Amino acid sequence: MLPNAIQLISQAIKDKRCIAIRYHDQRQIRVVEPHAIYTDERGELVMDCYQTRGYSASGRPPPFWRPFRMKKITAVSVLKETFQPRITEGFSANRLKYRSGLVAIVQDSQPVFGYVYPSHTTEVGPHLPGKA
């Protein structure tokens, strides 16, 4: 594994920046949106990514989800291109595999919506009608 790969990719995850990687000594480049780095059940560091373009050993054309073993990444370049978490494509920060050994995970920047239930309100302040 590259000496500074974890730091570079963790920062890319935090900043929601795409990265270009070389994997397993292959010459071809893959462009991915890194969503999480975690330790799997075998104790290996894994990066979950949404690959948007570049080489695919399976021949399947991107885009698709793909895990990458950190120890097999031979080159990393952080790109200027940004991304939003792929919630509609299946990403969830609540997956069981992320609960232990999590190194970095993308934060969803979508607004949180809620409901106000009248039975759960509390009156505060003298500014309310009928208050002195």
Which residues fall in each region the model found?
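Core beta-strand-centered patch of the WYL/Sm-like small regulatory domain
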Residues: 1-132
